[in-house]
C-alpha cells in the first residue's frame, strides 16, 4: 500500500521561506520566477510575494493535458542572454518527481535558442536555477535542484505526497 503524506498550508509557507533563505545564503537573486502549472504556481507566487520579484507561469503538463506543454521562446532567450546579458530565472515546481518536467524545460529551451552553442552549459545552475518543495533523489533530473526543502527517494519508499491545493473536492 502506498504511504500518503499530506502537507498543510503552514508547511508550504515554511518551505517557501526556506527556499528564499537558501537563495539569500547563496547571494543569488532571480530577475523573475517561473511557476510551473499546476503544482509550481502556488509556491512560486508565495516566493514572489515574499521577495517582491515578479512571477511568470509556464505550462508543462506532460501527462494530464491532451494539449501538452507550451514552449516559451522568450524565456529561453532570457536564460541564454540572446539579446542582452543572461537573466537570472528561478523555475519552481512542487516536486521533482521523475525529472521529466525539468528535463523537458532544459531540452526545449536549448533547442529553441541557438541549440548548438556551448554557452548553454553555463546557463543551468548559474543564471537558471530549479527549486522544488520536494526532491525525489531517484529522479532522472541530472542537473539537481539548487533549492529544495524535503528529499525523498521513491526507489526506496513508495510515498504519495498530497499538497493542500490537491486536497480539495471536485466540483461539477
Please tell me what each predicted stretch does.
Residues 32, 56, 90, 129-132:
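A structural signal for isolated positions on well-ordered beta-strands in alpha/beta enzyme cores
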Residues 28-37:
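Short glycine-rich phosphate-binding loop at a beta-alpha junction
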Residues 21, 45, 49, 107-111:
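Short, well-ordered alpha-helices that flank and scaffold nucleotide-derived cofactor binding pockets
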Residues 16, 40-44, 48, 102:
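Short, highly selective alpha-helical patches that border small-molecule cofactor pockets
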Residues 2-5, 26, 107-172:
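PRPP-dependent phosphoribosyltransferase catalytic core
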Residues 1-29, 65:
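Active-site-facing substrate-recognition patch
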Amino acid at each position: 500500500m502506498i504511504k500518503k503524506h499530506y502537507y498543510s498550508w503552514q508547511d508550504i509557507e515554511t518551505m517557501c521561506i526556506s527556499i528564499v533563505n537558501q537563495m539569500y545564503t547563496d547571494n543569488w537573486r532571480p530577475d523573475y520566477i517561473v511557476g510551473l502549472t499546476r503544482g509550481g504556481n502556488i509556491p512560486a507566487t508565495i516566493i514572489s510575494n515574499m521577495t517582491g520579484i515578479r512571477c511568470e507561469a509556464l505550462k508543462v503538463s506532460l501527462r494530464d493535458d491532451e494539449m501538452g506543454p507550451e514552449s516559451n521562446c522568450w524565456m529561453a532567450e532570457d536564460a541564454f542572454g540572446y539579446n542582452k546579458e543572461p537573466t537570472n530565472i528561478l523555475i519552481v515546481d512542487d516536486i521533482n518527481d521523475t525529472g521529466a518536467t525539468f528535463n523537458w524545460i532544459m531540452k526545449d529551451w536549448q533547442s529553441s535558442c541557438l541549440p548548438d552553442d556551448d554557452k548553454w552549459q553555463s546557463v543551468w545552475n548559474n543564471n537558471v536555477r530549479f527549486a522544488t518543495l520536494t526532491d525525489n533523489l531517484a529522479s532522472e533530473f541530472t542537473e539537481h535542484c539548487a533549492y529544495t526543502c524535503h528529499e525523498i527517494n521513491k526507489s526506496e519508499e513508495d510515498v504519495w505526497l498530497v499538497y493542500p491545493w490537491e486536497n480539495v473536492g471536485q466540483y461539477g
